[in-house]
Swiss-Prot record:
Organism expressing this protein natively: Mycobacterium bovis (strain ATCC BAA-935 / AF2122/97)
Protein name, entry field: Phosphatidate cytidylyltransferase
Segments of this protein annotated with the region Disordered: 1-28
Catalytic activity: a 1,2-diacyl-sn-glycero-3-phosphate + CTP + H(+) = a CDP-1,2-diacyl-sn-glycerol + diphosphate
GO CC terms, sorted: plasma membrane
């Protein structure tokens, strides 16, 4: 999840050759409509807080809907780039991976994921593509099977499988606390990276992937993310401050890596955002890029340190 185009956030991606240019709009220095981003972010935050406090199991339904929307966003972008992606088994399999965690936990998530991948591999064998690959004449497309399936499996891991780990966070007795701990860490990391990166960012981290991510912004992410996690881990999940500090480092790293992965994917596809669902943010996947790997990390820690 990232609101940033500086520090540890997403860059204003440079479109690949032939990609459509997006019209310029009034934005902040980071390249976003800051006012819209704040309003949307606060609205989503208030809804999630209410759910986690009063009806925590509804979190699973929210994750399931997010899985559906984010998967569709990425599939659409991949198809625009010429990949032949089996969307129906991805959408259905993603729901299976999330909902099977309710009765079966991690076993259900892995079963849903494994079944989804197998069905996608078979489904792709019989897909027709007379639009982006017209030479097939409407017959099953024999070319690019490996690249299409590789992109499909990557997407299945990136969104449905990672989302299923996010759903499992809420099941333990203190599950809401763990979700809050992870979410607050990601938000604090983003905000700290944005502020410090915009004000002081001079040394790019990975200029070939994301030119506006700076080491100064990453330092801001570390300070804010670790501080927030120490507080939330101590008071919400009953961990010692040193465990909170380690969790903070872990969450900041997973958030930054998630941002970089999505930045690389968008650079490969020649796009700036995955979608337009959330004003000031882009698509839903542009909000989830840092959250998803952090959810996996949080579940692993929760499992190893109950």
């Amino acid at each position: 999840m990232t609101t940033n185009d500086a520090g540890t956030g997403n860059p204003a991606e440079q479109p690949a050759r032939g990609a459509k240019q997006q019209p310029a709009t009034e934005t902040s220095r980071a390249g976003r409509d800051l006012r819209a981003a704040i309003v949307v972010g606060l609205s989503i935050g208030l809804v999630l807080i209410a759910v986690l406090v009063f009806v925590p199991r509804v979190w699973v339904a929210i994750v399931a809907v997010a899985t559906l929307v984010a998967t569709h966003e990425v599939v659409r972008r991949l198809r625009e780039a010429g990949y032949l992606i089996p969307v129906i088994p991805l959408l259905i399999g993603g729901q299976a991976a999330v909902w099977l965690t309710w009765p079966f936990g991690a076993v259900g998530a892995l079963a849903g994921f494994g079944g989804m991948v197998v069905v996608c591999m078979i489904w792709r064998l019989f897909m027709q593509d007379s639009v982006t690959r017209p030479t097939t004449g409407g017959a099953p497309s024999p070319g690019n099977y490996l690249s299409d399936v590789s992109a499909t499996v990557f997407l299945a891991v990136w969104v449905p499988l990672f989302c299923s780990f996010g759903a499992m966070l809420v099941y333990p007795e203190n599950g809401s606390g763990w979700v809050f701990c992870m979410m607050i860490a990601v938000i604090a990391s983003d905000v700290g990276g944005y502020a410090v990166g915009v004000l002081f960012g001079k040394h790019p981290m990975v200029p070939t992937i994301s030119p506006k991510k700076s080491w100064e912004g990453f330092a801001g992410s570390l300070v804010c993310g670790i501080t927030a996690t120490i507080i939330t881990a101590t008071f919400l999940v009953g961990k010692t401050p040193w465990i909170g500090a380690l969790l903070g480092v872990l969450f900041v790293l997973t958030t930054a890596l998630g941002d970089l992965v999505e930045s690389q994917v968008k650079r490969d596809l020649g796009i700036k955002d995955m979608g337009r669902l959330l004003p000031g943010h882009g698509g839903l996947m542009d909000r989830l890029d840092g959250i998803l790997p952090s959810a996996v990390a949080a579940w692993i820690v929760l499992t190893l340190l109950p």
